[in-house]
Structures are given as structure tokens and as C-alpha cells.
Amino acid sequence: MLEPSNLKTTSGSEHRGAMSIQLLLFVDERPSSHEHIEQIQHYLNSLKPDYPYELQIIEIHEQPHLVEHFRLVAAPALVKVFPEPRQTLAGSNIVNQLKKWWPRWQLDLEESQTENTNNRQTEQTKAESLNSVGYSAELMKLSDEIFRLKKEKDELLQQLKFKDQVLAMLAHDLRSPLTAASIAVETLELTQKQEDTERRAQLREQLYHQARKQFRVMNRLITDILQASKTMTAQLSVYYHDLFLPVLCQDILDEYREIFKEKSLTLVKDIPQDIPTVYADEELIRQVIVNLLDNAIKYTPSGGKVTVSILHRTTQKVQVSICDTGPGIPEEKQERIFEGHFRLKRDQEKEGYGLGLSLCRKIIRTHYGQIWVDSVPDQGSCFHFTLPVCR
């Protein structure tokens, strides 16, 4: 039912027990609305006592469901809900329209009274009409709630389905590096019982290297899954503060020094020290840079080049760019790579599930920045993102 605070009712005082013409007046918050209410009430009160009516005043912002139910497109609007058929008058000249239609409505009311000769039936008809507006509002609210719950259910089912797929992929993909690492460790165990020679020392070093590499692969697979799970089930907690990007980038690059060396990659840095601070969450931005750097290293062939640069693009934004000399990304796929579950054909043999870029976009958008890629097939890719300058 409608809340009493949302409806203001006036009526012909001498006909409270009789059937009456029932009207709904929809008004907005404009100052002129009060004037329209007074004009309509003045006209209705000026009618002869033989013309009973009940007028409910409804504020649009408090009852949007009723506005939708009656399909109103303008305010003020006067809706006759009884006797049937329903009729709507709208615009600034409602009083003139009332003068035209009131005699017809009175005839309709008299016909309804004639048809309902039984007193109980008359009162029931009136009560049903009085409550119809409230029921309509409740039905509209329930309909909206059902739609919202259905949408939420579909989204949850989609998430569960995707997580099942990812778990199956994880179990399959972990098998290979786990087996390789296990063989390396078992071989190391066997070499412990043999005499040390230069050849066995080299073999042990190779086995250690192989085991470390496979453990890194497994760690990356699991990290990817955990990031995706966190992204889909919770909102990001962002702790903004002043952040000096050159220091953050250098710290990350120092951690990757050995990886660049192992793959014989050239690192080119263009990181000016006069870059202004940005307003951002350090851990989340670190996650973005690490993800983009991981991708650049993964797709750049041995002997290739990775470039990291920072640019004070405008007075309001700083831009970070991470470029590689890998296979590039087809133009028609450059937007889709930021979707949650999308993977390029080239990635089928790579570890990971293509979830990192989706998380990166969410983080950057949370910081009111932008993230995009410039790429030409066979010529590499450049990923860029912007962050707001601290003021």
C-alpha cells in the first residue's frame, strides 16, 4: 500500500460515504506545482455539492513506480481512476480540460451508481478503486525487485560457471610444471649420492634453474586465479595518497633484473625525475605495472626489447607506458583483451587465463584514469595508463 506521507487527499465533504469521482494529481517539486494544486482544488470546490470527488496529490519523486504505471510523460498530470475508463489530463491548462470533461465524468459516475444497486457491492467497488493505486505501486515495486534478483542470480551463476572452468584449467595447467619440478627435485636427490664433478655441478645448477622456473609458472597461475576471484567477489579497497611513480617503477624493475638477464632482454627506461606525484593507491598501481611488465616479458622473444616510460602528459595527468617487441595484437581484438575471460589465440600455449588486464582496467578506472593499448601485429604492443596528478 502507499505510504500516507506520500498522498494528500481532499474530498467533497458532504459525500464521504457515497461513490465519488476519484482523481490522482501528480506534481513535481517546481514552485509552480503549488499554484496548479490550488487552481484545481479551487475549481473542484466551486462545483455544486452534487458532484462528489476525492483528490489524491502525489509527489512524483516519492512515487516513481506510479508514474511508470500510469505512463505519465509530463507534470502536472491529473488521472481519473474511477469511474472507468481511466483518463489522463496533462499540461498547464488542466482546469480548462476539467471544465470540458467533468460533465462526462459525472454521467459515468451516475451510470456506475445505477449499475451497482446493491449497497454492499457499491462499497466494495469503491474500496477496490481506492486501493487500486496502492496495489499498483506495490506490484511495480515487486516487479522491479524480481527483475533485480533475477539479474543478480544470472550474474552469480555466470561467475560460478566461470570459476568451475578456471579450476578445471588450473588443475590441467598445473600438472605439467608440477611434474617437471618434481622430476628436477628427484634428480637432484639422486645426484646427492654421487661424487661431485664439474659436470654434476653444472647439472645441479641446471636442475635448480628448471625447478625455480616451474615454481614461478605455478605461482603465476595461482596468483592469476586469486586476483580474478578477488575482483569478481568484492569491491576494490582503495587507499589514496601521494605517490611518486619514478621510485615505484624503479623498485619494480630492480626486482625483474634477473628475469631480464635470463631471457637476454634489453630494458630501456625513460623515467624523468621531475614527474609530479599522483593521487593513487601504491599497492594497486604496483599490481598494474607488474601485470603489464609480466605480459611484456612473456611475449617478447629472447633478445628483444622492453621499454618503460613515464610522461607528464597534461597538467592533470601522468601517463605510464610499457612497450614490448612481441607479436602484437590484432586491431579488432585490442578492446576485447580487457574483458574478464578473453584470451588471444596466441595465448593458448601460455600460462595464465587472461584475467590480469581486466583487473588492471578496473583498478585504473577506480583511480579515474584510462588504460588502452597501441599495437601493430608483428611489431609489438604499447600499454598505456593515466593517473590524476596530486593537487
Swiss-Prot record:
GO terms assigned for molecular function: ATP binding; phosphorelay sensor kinase activity
Catalysis performed (reactions): ATP + protein L-histidine = ADP + protein N-phospho-L-histidine
Modified-residue entries (Phosphohistidine), positions: H172
One Pfam match: HATPase_c
InterPro entries given in the database record: HATPase_C_sf, His_kinase_dom, HisK_dim/P_dom, HisK_dim/P_sf, KaiB_domain, Kinase_SasA, Sensor_HK_Regulatory, Sig_transdc_His_kin-like_C
Entry-linked PROSITE patterns: HIS_KIN (PS50109)
UniProt keyword annotations, A-Z: ATP-binding, Biological rhythms, Kinase, Nucleotide-binding, Phosphoprotein, Transferase, Two-component regulatory system
Gene3D superfamilies: 1.10.287.130, Glutaredoxin, Histidine kinase-like ATPase, C-terminal domain
Swiss-Prot/TrEMBL domain comment: The N-terminus interacts with KaiC, while the C-terminal histidine kinase domain autophosphorylates and is probably responsible for self-oligomerization. The N-terminal domain stimulates the C-terminus to autophosphorylate.
Protein name as annotated: Adaptive-response sensory kinase SasA
Organism lineage: Bacteria, Bacillati, Cyanobacteriota, Cyanophyceae, Oscillatoriophycideae
